[in-house]
Amino acid sequence: MAKQYDSVECPFCDEVSKYEKLAKIGQGTFGEVFKARHRKTGQKVALKKVLMENEKEGFPITALREIKILQLLKHENVVNLIEICRTKASPYNRCKGSIYLVFDFCEHDLAGLLSNVLVKFTLSEIKRVMQMLLNGLYYIHRNKILHRDMKAANVLITRDGVLKLADFGLARAFSLAKNSQPNRYTNRVVTLWYRPPELLLGERDYGPPIDLWGAGCIMAEMWTRSPIMQGNTEQHQLALISQLCGSITPEVWPNVDNYELYEKLELVKGQKRKVKDRLKAYVRDPYALDLIDKLLVLDPAQRIDSDDALNHDFFWSDPMPSDLKGMLSTHLTSMFEYLAPPRRKGSQITQQSTNQSRNPATTNQTEFERVF
C-alpha cells in the first residue's frame, strides 16, 4: 500500500531529510512552516508542509496552483520557491507521505516586526517598505496573478531589508471577462480584517484592486502597529469600513446596488468618509495620508493601482525611501506573527514614531487608542 501511495506523489523530488528542522515559525489552515538548514551546505530555508489530511484523491489542487504560480513568478519582491521535497509513504506515517515547499529563508514577517515595540520604523523606512510591497504587487498583477491574501503576516522581510510577498496559497490567475460573461471567482478569500468591500458584498468578477485594498490596510498599520479594522463577522467588517470610508451608496460607488448582497445586508447609513481625519493622529505625513486614502477607496474602479501608487508624491518627497538593513541589524532575533503576542484591539501598543532619531528620550512614546 505504501508503495502504491508513494507512486502518486513526487518521484523526482528529493527527500526532505536533506534539511534539518530548527524551529516552527508558522501555522495555519495550509499546514505548518519550519525554519530549517541544509545539512550539507548550511543554507537556511523555510519548509512549508502541505496539509494532506483531507486529500483522498492525491495531491491537493490548491497546492498545485500555488506551486505553478510560484514557478512562474521570479522577482526580488516575491518569495522564491527553491524546490519541492517529500517524505516517503511508510507504515510510520499511515502510508501517507508528506510534501514540503522549500523557500529562501526570510528572517521576519511584517506582523512580527510591528508587534515588537522595540522595532521603530522611520518615515523613510516606511516608504521603502511600501515601495517594495507595491513593486511586488505591480509585478504579479502584470503577470495576471492575484495574491488574494494580502496581510502583514504574509509580507516577509530579510535581514538585509528586502521585502518579499509570501503565501500564495490563495493566489490565482485572472483575466478580463470574455464576451460580456463575467468571471465567477470565489469571494471567500482574503483574511477578514483585510477583505475589501466588493468581496464582502459578494462580488465574484474582481481583479487587482482587491490586493490594493490590503496594501492600504497594511500601510496604515505601519503607524497604528495593529490592524485598523478588526471585524468579528462580515457584517461587522462592512460596518467598520463604512465608519472609516463612508456609507456604501450608488452615489459614491456606481452600480454597487447590483451586487448580490447589497440589499440583503444591513449597511450603515449616513456615514461620511473620514479616512484622513481618523488616521491623522497617527500618520503625520500628508502625502502618506493621501496615499492611504486613495488605496482605501470603496469603489474598486476608482481605487489607485500599483503603478500610480508607486508614482505618488509619497515616494518622491523628502525624506526619500531608505534602506532597512541598518535598522534590522540591531534586531538579531527573528520576528514572526506566529511567535508574537496577538495584535488585537485593546492591546496597549506604542504609537509608531516617524522621527529620524531612535533615541528613546526623543521618540514619541504616547499610547494610542485603536482606530476602532
UniProtKB/Swiss-Prot annotation:
Subcellular localization: Nucleus; Cytoplasm; Nucleus, PML body
Effect ascribed to mutating T186A: Abrogates autophosphorylation; no effect on kinase activity, but impaired CTD phosphorylation
Residue ranges constituting the Protein kinase domain according to the UniProt record: 19-315
Biased composition (Polar residues): 347-366
Entries under InterPro entries matching the protein: CDK (IPR050108), Kinase-like_dom_sf (IPR011009), Prot_kinase_dom (IPR000719), Protein_kinase_ATP_BS (IPR017441), Ser/Thr_kinase_AS (IPR008271)
Pfam families per UniProt: Pkinase
CDD domains: STKc_CDK9 (cd07865)
Name of the protein this chain belongs to: Cyclin-dependent kinase 9
EC number: 2.7.11.22, 2.7.11.23
PANTHER family registered for this protein in UniProt: CELL DIVISION PROTEIN KINASE (PTHR24056), CYCLIN-DEPENDENT KINASE 9 (PTHR24056:SF233)
Subunit annotation: Component of the super elongation complex (SEC), at least composed of EAF1, EAF2, CDK9, MLLT3/AF9, AFF (AFF1 or AFF4), the P-TEFb complex and ELL (ELL, ELL2 or ELL3). Associates with CCNT1/cyclin-T1, CCNT2/cyclin-T2 (isoform A and isoform B) or CCNK/cyclin-K to form active P-TEFb. P-TEFb forms a complex with AFF4/AF5Q31 and is part of the super elongation complex (SEC). Component of a complex which is composed of at least 5 members: HTATSF1/Tat-SF1, P-TEFb complex, RNA pol II, SUPT5H and NCL/nucleolin. (Microbial infection) Interacts with the acidic/proline-rich region of HIV-1 and HIV-2 Tat via T-loop region and is thus required for HIV to hijack host transcription machinery during its replication through cooperative binding to viral TAR RNA.
